[in-house]
Every structure is written in C-alpha cells, then in structure tokens.
Amino acid sequence: MDIKSMTLDELKDACQQMGEKPFRAKQLYDWMHHRLAGSYDEMTNLSLAFREKLKEQYPLTCLEKVQVQESKIDGTRKYLFRLSDGNVIESVWMKYHHGNSVCISSQVGCRMGCKFCASGLNGRTRSLSAGEILDEILFMQKDSGEKVSNIVLMGTGEPLDNYDNVLKFLHLVSCPEGINIGQRHISLSTSGIADRIEMLAREKLQITLSVSLHAPDDETRSSIMPVNDAYP
C-alpha cells in the first residue's frame, strides 16, 4: 500500500510489523502531513535503520510539478503534475478573501464520456490512490506556503467511479492528526452514479454533494451525458 494512503492506525500497524514502537507512526504522519517531507532522509528524528526499512518496504513517492500557469488577474494557479508511473493530472489553486480553495483530480482520465468535457476523450487510464489525491493538496500547500481551507473534487475523473479511494481520502484529509480540513469545507461533484450516491449517503459524512445536471430533461441529458442512460 502507498504509505500516504495509510490511516494513522494502519501506519501504527505497519511500524509495529517493522519492529518499531507505535509512536513512530505519529512522527511519520507529522512528517508527511505537516512538515511535507519529500523523502525519508528529511525525517531526522527517525533512526537511519528505520528510514532504510521504510525506503525498502514503502517507497515514498511524490508528485512532480511539470507546469504551472498563473492568472495575472487573481493569482489562480493551474498545476500539471506527473505521477510516479508517468501519467499526468491537473489541479487548481484558487485564492479568495475567505481562504484558499483547491480543485483536485480523482482519476487519470475519465470513462463517463460527457460530450462537453475533455477529460474523457481518451477514456480512463486508472484511478488515483487515496494518497495520490491527498498529495495534490500537500504539494500545493508546500508550494504556496499557505494552508488549504476548501476542497472541491471536481478535477479530472468521476470521484464516485473511484469510490473506495475517494472515501479513504475524505477520511485522511479530515483526520485531526493530519491536515484536518473540516468535511463541511469539502465538496464532491458527480455526474450522477446513483447507487454510489446512496452508498455515500450511508457514510453520514458532512461533505457537500454536487450533481452535474447540464440539461433540463432526460432526453437532452442523455445526448450529452451517457451516464444518464444507466441512471436516468
């Protein structure tokens, strides 16, 4: 498992399996989520032997910034990131008077096939792990030197088509020991996968759910959003 996808409890179990005390997990969590370490070598309060075990068993991967476009009007920044496997995703940083909002991706490509969206032109390549989704936020916080206050899951991909990883991400990003962004400051946008919406509702999260309609009737919506035929 990607180490950034681990909850604090999972990290404690991993540390114990490597012969380390559970408190090491909190140190690791702090380095990844607060100090935004880019490598294990930066984690100087961990022993060299432990760092070597981590490198061997849980390679620490980070997003690579390929390009940034910044608006001269309001300072909005659009990032192009390269993942560890060479695939690329986009994220957006938006600065407002009430705080900093980010729009993040949940997949490489998309298989929903909405005719107005370029994200699905080549279909879905793969889904992002919870840690990769989280890493978009961690990178932009480190790059800006400022904290994110609002999250919108409205970038590339259909979040509910990556249900398990997105759900885990929501728990990670709102974890009190992590970057602790309140769930009421998180919005998830979906094209309307009805059964996953019902599953999400049963989780009793405090996030905002936005359903993209894009049409006033079923006939028009089906002509531009194939998902409407499956979930009219």
Name these PLM-found stretches.
Residues 121-150:
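Conserved alpha-helical substructure of the radical SAM core
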Residues 141-150, 155-232:
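Conserved AdoMet/S-adenosylmethionine-binding subsite of the radical SAM
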Residues 31, 117-118, 149-154:
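Short beta-strands and strand-loop turn motifs
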Residues 95-132:
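Canonical Radical SAM [4Fe-4S] cluster-binding loop centered on the CxxxCxxC motif
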Residues 71, 105-106, 119, 189, ...:
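Short linear Ser/Thr-Pro motifs
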Residues 1-100:
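Flexible, acidic/Gly-rich N-terminal and inter-domain linker regions that tether
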